[in-house]
Protein backbone atom coordinates (compact mmCIF):
# COMPACT_ATOMS: atom_id res chain seq x y z
CA UNK A 1 0.00 0.00 0.00
CA UNK A 2 3.02 2.30 0.31
CA UNK A 3 3.69 2.33 -3.45
CA UNK A 4 3.46 5.66 -5.21
CA UNK A 5 1.42 3.89 -7.90
CA UNK A 6 -1.44 3.12 -5.50
CA UNK A 7 -4.65 4.83 -6.53
CA UNK A 8 -8.02 5.02 -4.81
CA UNK A 9 -11.67 5.71 -5.43
CA UNK A 10 -12.72 8.78 -3.46
CA UNK A 11 -16.04 10.47 -2.80
CA UNK A 12 -16.50 14.16 -2.06
CA UNK A 13 -19.57 15.70 -0.42
CA UNK A 14 -18.99 19.41 0.30
CA UNK A 15 -21.35 21.90 1.92
CA UNK A 16 -23.64 23.48 -0.67
CA UNK A 17 -21.79 26.82 -0.50
CA UNK A 18 -20.36 28.04 -3.80
CA UNK A 19 -16.88 28.56 -2.35
CA UNK A 20 -16.94 25.11 -0.76
CA UNK A 21 -18.01 23.39 -3.99
CA UNK A 22 -15.29 25.08 -6.04
CA UNK A 23 -12.70 24.54 -3.30
CA UNK A 24 -13.43 20.81 -3.16
CA UNK A 25 -13.36 20.62 -6.94
CA UNK A 26 -9.93 22.21 -6.99
CA UNK A 27 -8.73 19.40 -4.70
CA UNK A 28 -10.53 16.83 -6.89
CA UNK A 29 -8.55 18.01 -9.91
CA UNK A 30 -5.29 17.77 -7.97
CA UNK A 31 -6.06 14.24 -6.77
CA UNK A 32 -7.19 13.13 -10.22
CA UNK A 33 -3.84 14.42 -11.45
CA UNK A 34 -2.31 11.71 -9.24
CA UNK A 35 -4.48 9.07 -10.90
CA UNK A 36 -7.22 8.79 -8.26
CA UNK A 37 -10.85 8.35 -9.25
CA UNK A 38 -13.28 10.91 -7.78
CA UNK A 39 -17.06 10.67 -7.38
CA UNK A 40 -18.25 14.22 -6.73
CA UNK A 41 -21.63 14.35 -4.97
CA UNK A 42 -23.46 17.52 -5.97
CA UNK A 43 -27.02 18.91 -6.25
CA UNK A 44 -28.27 17.82 -9.67
CA UNK A 45 -28.97 21.27 -11.15
CA UNK A 46 -25.67 22.69 -9.89
CA UNK A 47 -23.55 20.16 -11.75
CA UNK A 48 -23.54 22.22 -14.95
CA UNK A 49 -21.88 25.12 -13.10
CA UNK A 50 -18.81 23.01 -12.27
CA UNK A 51 -18.44 20.93 -15.42
CA UNK A 52 -16.15 23.48 -17.07
CA UNK A 53 -13.72 23.16 -14.12
CA UNK A 54 -13.28 19.41 -14.68
CA UNK A 55 -9.72 18.92 -15.92
CA UNK A 56 -9.95 15.11 -15.73
CA UNK A 57 -13.41 14.02 -16.98
CA UNK A 58 -12.20 10.42 -17.37
CA UNK A 59 -11.47 10.28 -13.61
CA UNK A 60 -13.89 12.78 -12.04
CA UNK A 61 -17.58 11.91 -12.31
CA UNK A 62 -20.58 13.76 -10.90
CA UNK A 63 -23.11 11.98 -8.70
CA UNK A 64 -26.37 13.99 -8.61
CA UNK A 65 -28.03 14.62 -5.25
CA UNK A 66 -31.65 15.67 -4.82
CA UNK A 67 -31.93 18.45 -2.22
CA UNK A 68 -34.98 17.67 -0.04
CA UNK A 69 -37.66 20.34 0.28
CA UNK A 70 -37.75 22.09 3.66
CA UNK A 71 -40.44 24.52 4.87
CA UNK A 72 -39.11 28.03 4.28
CA UNK A 73 -36.47 26.98 1.74
CA UNK A 74 -37.12 28.52 -1.70
CA UNK A 75 -38.29 25.91 -4.24
CA UNK A 76 -35.37 24.61 -6.28
CA UNK A 77 -32.74 26.08 -3.94
CA UNK A 78 -29.51 24.06 -4.08
CA UNK A 79 -26.65 26.33 -3.01
CA UNK A 80 -26.06 29.33 -0.75
CA UNK A 81 -26.36 31.60 -3.79
CA UNK A 82 -30.02 30.52 -4.06
CA UNK A 83 -31.03 31.56 -0.53
CA UNK A 84 -30.72 34.74 1.55
CA UNK A 85 -28.01 34.54 4.21
CA UNK A 86 -30.45 34.32 7.17
CA UNK A 87 -31.94 31.15 5.60
CA UNK A 88 -28.73 29.18 5.07
CA UNK A 89 -29.51 27.07 8.14
CA UNK A 90 -32.49 25.68 6.21
CA UNK A 91 -30.17 24.58 3.40
CA UNK A 92 -28.02 22.84 6.02
CA UNK A 93 -31.12 21.13 7.39
CA UNK A 94 -31.94 19.94 3.88
CA UNK A 95 -28.40 18.61 3.43
CA UNK A 96 -28.67 16.69 6.71
CA UNK A 97 -31.80 15.00 5.37
CA UNK A 98 -29.75 13.45 2.55
CA UNK A 99 -28.03 11.14 5.06
CA UNK A 100 -29.89 7.97 4.02
CA UNK A 101 -29.31 8.71 0.33
CA UNK A 102 -25.60 9.29 0.95
CA UNK A 103 -25.26 5.97 2.77
CA UNK A 104 -26.83 4.13 -0.18
CA UNK A 105 -24.64 5.99 -2.68
CA UNK A 106 -21.40 5.35 -0.78
CA UNK A 107 -22.20 1.65 -0.42
CA UNK A 108 -22.95 1.43 -4.13
CA UNK A 109 -19.82 3.35 -5.18
CA UNK A 110 -17.53 1.23 -2.97
CA UNK A 111 -15.18 4.13 -2.30
CA UNK A 112 -12.06 3.98 -0.13
CA UNK A 113 -12.45 7.41 1.47
CA UNK A 114 -14.90 10.29 1.62
CA UNK A 115 -13.97 13.98 1.89
CA UNK A 116 -16.56 16.23 3.59
CA UNK A 117 -16.92 19.35 5.74
CA UNK A 118 -20.20 20.45 7.36
CA UNK A 119 -21.91 17.03 7.43
CA UNK A 120 -20.87 16.11 10.98
CA UNK A 121 -22.70 12.78 10.70
CA UNK A 122 -20.58 11.51 7.81
CA UNK A 123 -17.61 10.11 9.81
CA UNK A 124 -19.82 7.73 11.82
CA UNK A 125 -21.69 6.74 8.66
CA UNK A 126 -18.37 6.06 6.91
CA UNK A 127 -17.12 3.92 9.80
CA UNK A 128 -20.33 1.90 9.69
CA UNK A 129 -19.73 0.93 6.07
CA UNK A 130 -15.97 0.48 6.43
CA UNK A 131 -14.50 3.54 4.73
CA UNK A 132 -12.25 6.34 5.95
CA UNK A 133 -13.37 9.95 6.29
CA UNK A 134 -11.25 13.09 5.83
CA UNK A 135 -12.46 16.52 6.89
CA UNK A 136 -11.38 18.93 4.16
CA UNK A 137 -11.47 22.60 5.06
CA UNK A 138 -11.76 25.40 2.53
CA UNK A 139 -10.73 27.85 5.26
CA UNK A 140 -7.50 28.41 7.15
CA UNK A 141 -6.17 25.96 9.78
CA UNK A 142 -5.43 29.05 11.88
CA UNK A 143 -9.19 29.61 12.06
CA UNK A 144 -9.83 26.10 13.36
CA UNK A 145 -6.96 26.29 15.80
CA UNK A 146 -8.10 29.63 17.21
CA UNK A 147 -11.84 28.98 17.40
CA UNK A 148 -12.28 25.20 17.72
CA UNK A 149 -9.31 24.08 19.80
CA UNK A 150 -10.23 21.45 22.43
CA UNK A 151 -8.36 23.71 24.87
CA UNK A 152 -11.35 26.05 24.73
CA UNK A 153 -13.96 23.41 25.50
CA UNK A 154 -14.69 23.02 29.20
CA UNK A 155 -17.62 20.74 30.04
CA UNK A 156 -20.53 22.74 31.41
CA UNK A 157 -18.94 26.12 30.60
CA UNK A 158 -20.24 28.39 27.86
CA UNK A 159 -17.58 30.32 25.92
CA UNK A 160 -17.70 34.04 26.63
CA UNK A 161 -16.80 37.07 24.56
CA UNK A 162 -13.71 37.56 26.74
CA UNK A 163 -12.62 33.97 26.04
CA UNK A 164 -12.82 34.48 22.29
CA UNK A 165 -10.88 37.76 22.35
CA UNK A 166 -7.67 35.90 23.20
CA UNK A 167 -6.02 32.86 21.66
CA UNK A 168 -6.06 29.45 23.41
CA UNK A 169 -3.36 28.92 26.05
CA UNK A 170 -0.82 27.04 23.90
CA UNK A 171 -1.70 28.70 20.58
CA UNK A 172 1.54 29.30 18.65
CA UNK A 173 0.95 33.00 17.91
CA UNK A 174 -0.67 34.88 20.82
CA UNK A 175 -0.52 38.14 18.83
CA UNK A 176 -3.52 36.87 16.82
CA UNK A 177 -6.56 38.27 18.64
CA UNK A 178 -10.17 39.25 18.03
CA UNK A 179 -11.67 42.66 18.71
CA UNK A 180 -14.68 42.88 21.01
CA UNK A 181 -17.26 43.10 18.21
CA UNK A 182 -15.65 40.16 16.39
CA UNK A 183 -15.52 38.00 19.52
CA UNK A 184 -19.20 38.79 20.08
CA UNK A 185 -20.04 37.41 16.65
CA UNK A 186 -17.97 34.26 17.19
CA UNK A 187 -19.53 33.68 20.61
CA UNK A 188 -23.01 33.98 19.11
CA UNK A 189 -22.17 31.18 16.69
CA UNK A 190 -21.37 28.87 19.61
CA UNK A 191 -25.06 28.93 20.55
CA UNK A 192 -26.68 29.54 17.15
CA UNK A 193 -28.48 26.49 15.77
CA UNK A 194 -27.34 25.61 12.26
CA UNK A 195 -29.46 22.90 10.69
CA UNK A 196 -31.57 20.93 13.15
CA UNK A 197 -30.79 20.84 16.85
CA UNK A 198 -27.04 21.48 16.76
CA UNK A 199 -25.04 24.69 16.98
CA UNK A 200 -22.68 25.75 14.21
CA UNK A 201 -19.61 25.33 16.45
CA UNK A 202 -20.68 21.90 17.71
CA UNK A 203 -21.33 20.80 14.15
CA UNK A 204 -17.84 21.77 12.97
CA UNK A 205 -16.12 20.52 16.14
CA UNK A 206 -17.82 17.13 15.75
CA UNK A 207 -16.99 17.00 12.04
CA UNK A 208 -13.32 17.66 12.82
CA UNK A 209 -12.91 15.50 15.93
CA UNK A 210 -14.73 12.44 14.48
CA UNK A 211 -12.70 12.36 11.26
CA UNK A 212 -9.84 10.01 10.42
CA UNK A 213 -7.76 12.89 9.10
CA UNK A 214 -7.80 16.63 8.41
CA UNK A 215 -6.91 18.26 5.10
CA UNK A 216 -6.21 21.88 4.22
CA UNK A 217 -5.21 23.84 1.13
CA UNK A 218 -2.23 25.67 2.56
CA UNK A 219 1.50 25.22 2.99
CA UNK A 220 3.84 24.91 5.95
CA UNK A 221 5.75 28.02 4.90
CA UNK A 222 2.62 30.10 5.60
CA UNK A 223 0.74 28.19 8.33
CA UNK A 224 3.00 25.39 9.48
CA UNK A 225 2.88 26.30 13.17
CA UNK A 226 -0.93 26.30 13.14
CA UNK A 227 -1.07 22.94 11.35
CA UNK A 228 1.21 21.45 14.01
CA UNK A 229 -1.02 22.92 16.72
CA UNK A 230 -4.15 21.35 15.20
CA UNK A 231 -2.42 17.98 14.77
CA UNK A 232 -1.47 18.02 18.45
CA UNK A 233 -4.83 19.27 19.73
CA UNK A 234 -7.05 16.92 17.71
CA UNK A 235 -4.60 14.01 17.50
CA UNK A 236 -5.31 13.60 13.79
CA UNK A 237 -2.96 13.46 10.81
CA UNK A 238 -2.98 16.74 8.88
CA UNK A 239 -2.66 16.58 5.09
CA UNK A 240 -1.62 19.71 3.19
CA UNK A 241 -2.55 20.11 -0.48
CA UNK A 242 -0.51 23.27 -0.97
CA UNK A 243 -1.95 26.77 -1.34
CA UNK A 244 -5.23 27.07 -3.24
CA UNK A 245 -3.90 29.22 -6.05
CA UNK A 246 -6.17 30.24 -8.93
CA UNK A 247 -5.93 28.39 -12.22
CA UNK A 248 -4.83 30.92 -14.87
CA UNK A 249 -7.86 32.25 -16.72
CA UNK A 250 -8.14 31.39 -20.41
CA UNK A 251 -10.73 34.09 -21.05
CA UNK A 252 -10.20 37.73 -21.97
CA UNK A 253 -11.53 40.78 -20.16
CA UNK A 254 -14.72 42.37 -21.45
CA UNK A 255 -13.73 45.12 -23.86
CA UNK A 256 -15.66 47.83 -22.03
CA UNK A 257 -13.75 47.19 -18.79
CA UNK A 258 -10.43 46.87 -20.59
CA UNK A 259 -11.03 50.19 -22.33
CA UNK A 260 -12.03 51.91 -19.07
CA UNK A 261 -9.02 50.63 -17.12
CA UNK A 262 -6.75 51.53 -20.01
CA UNK A 263 -7.51 55.23 -19.47
CA UNK A 264 -5.56 55.30 -16.21
CA UNK A 265 -1.86 55.05 -15.49
CA UNK A 266 -0.19 51.87 -14.31
CA UNK A 267 -0.94 50.84 -10.73
CA UNK A 268 -3.33 53.74 -10.06
CA UNK A 269 -6.77 52.05 -9.94
CA UNK A 270 -8.42 50.60 -6.81
CA UNK A 271 -10.34 47.37 -7.41
CA UNK A 272 -12.86 46.62 -4.64
CA UNK A 273 -14.86 43.37 -4.48
CA UNK A 274 -16.63 41.50 -1.69
CA UNK A 275 -17.42 38.15 -3.31
CA UNK A 276 -20.61 36.51 -4.53
CA UNK A 277 -22.24 36.04 -1.11
CA UNK A 278 -21.39 39.16 0.90
CA UNK A 279 -24.16 41.75 1.11
CA UNK A 280 -23.60 45.00 3.02
CA UNK A 281 -26.08 47.18 4.84
CA UNK A 282 -26.86 50.32 2.88
CA UNK A 283 -25.02 52.61 5.30
CA UNK A 284 -21.87 50.43 5.14
CA UNK A 285 -22.14 50.21 1.36
CA UNK A 286 -22.27 53.99 1.06
CA UNK A 287 -19.50 54.62 3.60
CA UNK A 288 -17.21 52.23 1.72
CA UNK A 289 -17.84 54.06 -1.56
CA UNK A 290 -17.28 57.44 0.09
CA UNK A 291 -13.98 56.08 1.42
CA UNK A 292 -12.87 55.03 -2.06
CA UNK A 293 -13.88 58.44 -3.41
CA UNK A 294 -11.94 60.17 -0.64
CA UNK A 295 -8.66 58.62 -1.83
CA UNK A 296 -8.87 60.70 -5.02
CA UNK A 297 -7.91 57.60 -7.01
CA UNK A 298 -9.94 55.96 -9.78
CA UNK A 299 -11.80 52.86 -8.58
CA UNK A 300 -13.92 49.95 -9.74
CA UNK A 301 -16.21 48.45 -7.06
CA UNK A 302 -17.89 45.11 -7.79
CA UNK A 303 -20.47 44.86 -5.01
CA UNK A 304 -23.85 43.22 -4.56
CA UNK A 305 -26.78 45.61 -4.06
CA UNK A 306 -27.10 46.34 -0.32
CA UNK A 307 -29.91 44.86 1.76
CA UNK A 308 -33.41 46.07 0.85
CA UNK A 309 -32.13 47.77 -2.32
CA UNK A 310 -32.96 46.63 -5.84
CA UNK A 311 -29.75 47.80 -7.50
CA UNK A 312 -26.38 49.36 -6.73
CA UNK A 313 -27.40 52.46 -8.68
CA UNK A 314 -30.37 53.03 -6.37
CA UNK A 315 -28.07 52.86 -3.32
CA UNK A 316 -25.54 55.47 -4.48
CA UNK A 317 -26.23 59.03 -3.24
CA UNK A 318 -26.61 61.58 -6.04
CA UNK A 319 -23.80 63.71 -4.62
CA UNK A 320 -21.44 60.73 -4.78
CA UNK A 321 -22.48 59.91 -8.36
CA UNK A 322 -21.45 63.41 -9.38
CA UNK A 323 -18.11 63.25 -7.56
CA UNK A 324 -17.02 59.92 -9.07
CA UNK A 325 -18.22 60.53 -12.61
CA UNK A 326 -15.50 59.44 -15.01
CA UNK A 327 -13.23 57.92 -12.35
CA UNK A 328 -15.43 55.55 -10.36
CA UNK A 329 -17.60 52.59 -11.39
CA UNK A 330 -19.91 50.68 -9.07
CA UNK A 331 -20.99 47.42 -10.69
CA UNK A 332 -23.58 45.05 -9.23
CA UNK A 333 -22.87 41.98 -11.35
CA UNK A 334 -20.13 39.36 -11.51
CA UNK A 335 -16.84 40.37 -13.13
CA UNK A 336 -13.70 38.45 -14.08
CA UNK A 337 -11.79 39.14 -10.87
CA UNK A 338 -8.55 37.42 -11.87
CA UNK A 339 -8.34 39.57 -14.98
CA UNK A 340 -8.96 42.77 -13.00
CA UNK A 341 -6.22 41.90 -10.51
CA UNK A 342 -3.83 41.12 -13.37
CA UNK A 343 -4.52 44.36 -15.24
CA UNK A 344 -1.51 46.72 -15.14
CA UNK A 345 -3.70 49.72 -14.23
CA UNK A 346 -4.91 48.07 -11.00
CA UNK A 347 -2.63 48.82 -8.06
CA UNK A 348 -4.81 48.15 -5.00
CA UNK A 349 -7.35 45.47 -4.03
CA UNK A 350 -9.88 46.20 -1.26
CA UNK A 351 -11.12 42.75 -0.22
CA UNK A 352 -13.67 41.19 2.16
CA UNK A 353 -10.95 38.61 2.87
CA UNK A 354 -12.45 35.46 1.42
CA UNK A 355 -9.53 33.03 1.13
CA UNK A 356 -9.99 32.48 -2.61
CA UNK A 357 -9.89 36.22 -3.25
CA UNK A 358 -6.80 36.68 -1.11
CA UNK A 359 -5.06 33.83 -2.94
CA UNK A 360 -5.76 35.60 -6.23
CA UNK A 361 -4.34 38.81 -4.79
CA UNK A 362 -1.16 37.19 -3.46
CA UNK A 363 -0.05 36.00 -6.91
CA UNK A 364 -0.57 39.46 -8.43
CA UNK A 365 1.21 42.80 -8.00
CA UNK A 366 -1.65 44.83 -6.50
CA UNK A 367 -1.43 45.91 -2.85
CA UNK A 368 -4.00 44.49 -0.42
CA UNK A 369 -6.44 46.35 1.85
CA UNK A 370 -8.38 44.11 4.23
CA UNK A 371 -11.99 44.75 5.21
CA UNK A 372 -13.34 41.47 6.68
CA UNK A 373 -17.04 41.08 7.42
CA UNK A 374 -17.74 37.77 9.15
CA UNK A 375 -16.30 34.51 10.48
CA UNK A 376 -13.20 33.14 8.80
CA UNK A 377 -12.71 36.39 6.87
CA UNK A 378 -11.65 38.01 10.16
CA UNK A 379 -9.00 35.37 10.82
CA UNK A 380 -7.84 35.56 7.20
CA UNK A 381 -7.33 39.30 7.66
CA UNK A 382 -5.17 38.68 10.75
CA UNK A 383 -3.02 36.20 8.81
CA UNK A 384 -2.44 38.78 6.09
CA UNK A 385 -1.90 41.80 8.34
CA UNK A 386 -0.33 40.33 11.51
CA UNK A 387 1.37 37.04 10.58
CA UNK A 388 2.48 37.69 7.00
CA UNK A 389 2.37 41.50 6.99
CA UNK A 390 1.36 41.65 3.31
CA UNK A 391 -1.66 43.94 3.70
CA UNK A 392 -3.26 46.62 5.85
CA UNK A 393 -6.58 46.15 7.63
CA UNK A 394 -9.16 48.93 7.73
CA UNK A 395 -9.60 50.22 11.29
CA UNK A 396 -13.00 49.67 12.92
CA UNK A 397 -14.59 50.62 16.21
CA UNK A 398 -13.55 48.20 18.96
CA UNK A 399 -17.08 47.71 20.30
CA UNK A 400 -19.36 48.33 17.33
CA UNK A 401 -17.14 47.17 14.44
CA UNK A 402 -18.08 50.22 12.37
CA UNK A 403 -15.59 51.53 9.81
CA UNK A 404 -15.52 55.08 8.48
CA UNK A 405 -14.76 56.54 5.07
CA UNK A 406 -11.65 58.05 6.61
CA UNK A 407 -10.40 54.65 7.80
CA UNK A 408 -10.95 53.15 4.33
CA UNK A 409 -9.03 56.03 2.75
CA UNK A 410 -6.24 55.76 5.34
CA UNK A 411 -5.68 52.04 4.68
CA UNK A 412 -5.61 52.49 0.91
CA UNK A 413 -3.14 55.36 1.10
CA UNK A 414 -0.94 53.39 3.53
CA UNK A 415 -0.39 50.51 1.10
CA UNK A 416 -0.15 52.75 -1.97
CA UNK A 417 2.53 55.04 -0.53
CA UNK A 418 5.80 53.42 -1.60
CA UNK A 419 7.81 55.86 0.52
CA UNK A 420 6.08 55.13 3.84
CA UNK A 421 7.41 52.49 6.24
CA UNK A 422 4.14 50.52 6.07
CA UNK A 423 4.01 50.75 2.29
CA UNK A 424 7.59 49.49 1.92
CA UNK A 425 7.05 46.66 4.41
CA UNK A 426 3.87 45.21 2.88
CA UNK A 427 5.22 45.55 -0.67
CA UNK A 428 8.46 43.81 0.25
CA UNK A 429 6.71 40.97 2.06
CA UNK A 430 4.16 40.59 -0.73
CA UNK A 431 6.90 40.42 -3.37
CA UNK A 432 8.75 37.67 -1.45
CA UNK A 433 5.59 35.64 -0.86
CA UNK A 434 4.47 35.98 -4.47
CA UNK A 435 7.84 34.71 -5.65
CA UNK A 436 7.53 31.67 -3.38
CA UNK A 437 3.94 30.91 -4.41
CA UNK A 438 4.76 31.15 -8.11
CA UNK A 439 7.45 28.45 -7.82
CA UNK A 440 6.54 25.88 -10.46
CA UNK A 441 7.48 22.93 -8.21
CA UNK A 442 5.47 24.03 -5.16
CA UNK A 443 2.18 22.35 -6.05
CA UNK A 444 3.69 19.02 -7.11
CA UNK A 445 5.83 18.91 -3.95
CA UNK A 446 2.81 19.30 -1.70
CA UNK A 447 0.59 16.92 -3.65
CA UNK A 448 3.30 14.23 -3.53
CA UNK A 449 3.33 14.60 0.26
CA UNK A 450 -0.49 14.69 0.43
CA UNK A 451 -0.67 11.53 -1.67
CA UNK A 452 1.80 9.70 0.56
CA UNK A 453 0.01 10.72 3.78
CA UNK A 454 -3.29 9.62 2.26
CA UNK A 455 -1.80 6.23 1.43
CA UNK A 456 -0.52 5.94 5.00
CA UNK A 457 -4.00 6.75 6.31
CA UNK A 458 -5.77 4.28 4.04
CA UNK A 459 -3.14 1.58 4.27
UniProtKB/Swiss-Prot annotation:
<feature type="active site" description="Charge relay">
    <location>
        <position position="117"/>
    </location>
</feature>
<dbReference type="Pfam" id="PF00201">
    <property type="entry name" value="UDPGT"/>
</dbReference>
<feature type="binding site">
    <location>
        <position position="375"/>
    </location>
    <ligand>
        <name>an anthocyanidin</name>
    </ligand>
</feature>
<feature type="binding site">
    <location>
        <position position="138"/>
    </location>
    <ligand>
        <name>UDP-alpha-D-glucose</name>
    </ligand>
</feature>
<dbReference type="GO" id="GO:0102455">
    <property type="term" value="F:anthocyanidin 3-O-glucoside 2''-O-glucosyltransferase activity"/>
</dbReference>
<feature type="binding site">
    <location>
        <position position="352"/>
    </location>
    <ligand>
        <name>UDP-alpha-D-glucose</name>
    </ligand>
</feature>
<feature type="binding site">
    <location>
        <position position="20"/>
    </location>
    <ligand>
        <name>an anthocyanidin</name>
    </ligand>
</feature>
<feature type="binding site">
    <location>
        <position position="360"/>
    </location>
    <ligand>
        <name>UDP-alpha-D-glucose</name>
    </ligand>
</feature>
<dbReference type="InterPro" id="IPR002213">
    <property type="entry name" value="UDP_glucos_trans"/>
</dbReference>
<feature type="binding site">
    <location>
        <position position="335"/>
    </location>
    <ligand>
        <name>UDP-alpha-D-glucose</name>
    </ligand>
</feature>
<feature type="binding site">
    <location>
        <position position="377"/>
    </location>
    <ligand>
        <name>UDP-alpha-D-glucose</name>
    </ligand>
</feature>
<feature type="active site" description="Proton acceptor">
    <location>
        <position position="20"/>
    </location>
</feature>
<comment type="similarity">
    <text>Belongs to the UDP-glycosyltransferase family.</text>
</comment>
<keyword id="KW-0808">Transferase</keyword>
<feature type="binding site">
    <location>
        <position position="355"/>
    </location>
    <ligand>
        <name>UDP-alpha-D-glucose</name>
    </ligand>
</feature>
<protein>
    <recommendedName>
        <fullName>Anthocyanidin 3-O-glucoside 2''-O-glucosyltransferase</fullName>
        <ecNumber>2.4.1.297</ecNumber>
    </recommendedName>
</protein>
<feature type="binding site">
    <location>
        <position position="337"/>
    </location>
    <ligand>
        <name>UDP-alpha-D-glucose</name>
    </ligand>
</feature>
<comment type="function">
    <text>Glycosyltransferase that mediates the glucosylation of anthocyanidin 3-O-glucosides to yield anthocyanidin 3-O-sophorosides. 3-O-sophoroside derivatives are required for the color of flowers.</text>
</comment>
<feature type="binding site">
    <location>
        <position position="357"/>
    </location>
    <ligand>
        <name>UDP-alpha-D-glucose</name>
    </ligand>
</feature>
<dbReference type="GO" id="GO:0035251">
    <property type="term" value="F:UDP-glucosyltransferase activity"/>
</dbReference>
<comment type="pathway">
    <text>Pigment biosynthesis; anthocyanin biosynthesis.</text>
</comment>
<feature type="binding site">
    <location>
        <position position="376"/>
    </location>
    <ligand>
        <name>UDP-alpha-D-glucose</name>
    </ligand>
</feature>
<keyword id="KW-0328">Glycosyltransferase</keyword>
<dbReference type="GO" id="GO:0009718">
    <property type="term" value="P:anthocyanin-containing compound biosynthetic process"/>
</dbReference>
<dbReference type="InterPro" id="IPR050481">
    <property type="entry name" value="UDP-glycosyltransf_plant"/>
</dbReference>
Amino acid sequence: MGSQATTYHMAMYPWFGVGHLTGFFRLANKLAGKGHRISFLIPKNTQSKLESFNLHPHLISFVPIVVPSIPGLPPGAETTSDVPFPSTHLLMEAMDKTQNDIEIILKDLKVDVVFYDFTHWLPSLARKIGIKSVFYSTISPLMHGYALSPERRVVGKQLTEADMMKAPASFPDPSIKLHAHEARGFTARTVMKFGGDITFFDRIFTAVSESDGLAYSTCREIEGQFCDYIETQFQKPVLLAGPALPVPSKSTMEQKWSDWLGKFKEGSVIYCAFGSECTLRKDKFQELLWGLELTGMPFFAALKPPFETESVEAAIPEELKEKIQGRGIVHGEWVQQQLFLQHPSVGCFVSHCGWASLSEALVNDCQIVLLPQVGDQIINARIMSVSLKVGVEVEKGEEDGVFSRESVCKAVKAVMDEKSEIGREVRGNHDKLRGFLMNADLDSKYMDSFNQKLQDLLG
